[in-house]
Amino acid sequence: MDAQNKEVDALVQKITGLHAAIAKLPSLSPSPDVDALFTDLVTACVPPSPVDVTKLGSEAQEMREGLIRLCSEAEGKLEAHYSDMLAAFDNPLDHLGMFPYYSNYINLSKLEYELLARYVPGRHRPARVAFIGSGPLPFSSYVLAARHLPDAMFDNYDLCSAANDRASKLFRADKDVGARMSFHTADVADLTGELAAYDVVFLAALVGMAAEDKTKVIAHLGAHMADGAALVVRSAHGHVGFLYPIVDPQDIGRGGFEVLAVCHPDDDVVNSVIIAHKSKDVHANERPNGVVDSTRGAVPVVSPPCRFGEMVADVTHKREEFTNAEVAF
C-alpha cells in the first residue's frame, strides 16, 4: 500500500509540475514547447496507474480542473491548426494521417461502433446521427461515416462557427461522405425538437467540462431524445481524468437513460466510452434515496488489451517527422 501511495504521489507531483509549466506558456497554439509539454502530459496519463482522481484532495482537484480547461483550449488550437493545413490540399480527406493522433480517433470510433452493435443492436445501422461537440477536425464523424455507418446522415454541432467553417471545408471534394455531413453552430441546450430525430447521439468528452455542466447536458438530452435512441458518451477513467472530465454512469441514469455498457480501454484509446439508450421506464427503478438503478443488473465493463506503446511510438514518430519537415506543431 505504501508503494502504491508513493506511486500516486509521484504521479500527482509530475502532473502538477506539467500543469504549472503549461499555465506559464504565453500561448497554447501549436509550437515545439506546447507540443513537448502536452506529449509529456499524455504519456504520463495513459499507462495503467492506481490513481483515482475522484479521491484527490481539494488542491489537486482544483489543479485538475484547471488542467482540463487548458487541455481543451490547446486541443482546439491544435485541431484548428491542422484543419487549416489539411484544407490547403485538393482533397483534404486523403491526408488525415498528418494529424499525430488520427489513429486514436480511428480506434475510438471503431470501439464505439462495436459497442453499439453489441449492446444496442437495433441502432448499429442508424439513419440519422448527431455528434455534439464536433470541432474543426470532425475525425470521429468522418471515421464513423466512412468506415462503419455508410448510409447514415450526420449532423455535427459545435458552439464555434469558425470551427464549423473549418470542418466543412475538409469535405468539399468528397461527394459521398461530404454529402452526408452537415455542420450547425448551436448550443446543445438550445436543441429541443431536433434531438428527437436522431437514432444515435454522440457526446464529445469536452462538452460540459465541469461535472454539473455535463449533468445538465445529459439531462437535456434525456428530456428531448426519442425513446430507444442510443447515447454514446465519452468519458475518462483513472488518471486520464487529468485530461478529460469523468462522467458518472449514475448521472446518465438520472438523465433518463439506461446504461448498457461502460468501457475503460487500457490500449491506445484514451477515452472511456459509456453506451446508453433513452428509456421511458428508467425512472420506474428509482430508489427512495433518489439514486436511479438504470442498469438492469451489472453493467458490462470492457477493457481491450493494452497497446499503449504503439500509440507513444506513433506520436513520437509523427513529432519527428513534422519537426524535420519544419512544420509548426
Swiss-Prot record:
Family annotation (Gene3D superfamilies): Vaccinia Virus protein VP39
Induction summary: Fivefold increase after iron deficiency.
Cystine pairings recorded for this chain: none
EC number of this enzyme: 2.5.1.43
Pfam family, one: NAS
InterPro entries: Nicotian_synth, SAM-dependent_MTases_sf
Keywords associated with the record: S-adenosyl-L-methionine, Transferase
Biological process according to GO: nicotianamine biosynthetic process
Alphabetized GO MF terms: nicotianamine synthase activity
Keyword hit for Magnesium: no
Coiled-coil intervals: none
Enzyme class: transferase
Catalytically driven reaction(s): 3 S-adenosyl-L-methionine = nicotianamine + 3 S-methyl-5'-thioadenosine + 3 H(+)
Family listed: Belongs to the nicotianamine synthase (NAS)-like family.
Role this protein plays: Synthesizes nicotianamine, a polyamine that is the first intermediate in the synthesis of the phytosiderophores of the mugineic acid type found in gramineae which serve as a sensor for the physiological iron status within the plant, and/or might be involved in the transport of iron.
Subunit note: Homotrimer.
The name this protein goes by in its record: Nicotianamine synthase 8
Naturally occurring in which organism (per UniProt): Hordeum vulgare (Barley)
Lineage summary: Eukaryota, Viridiplantae, Streptophyta, Embryophyta, Tracheophyta
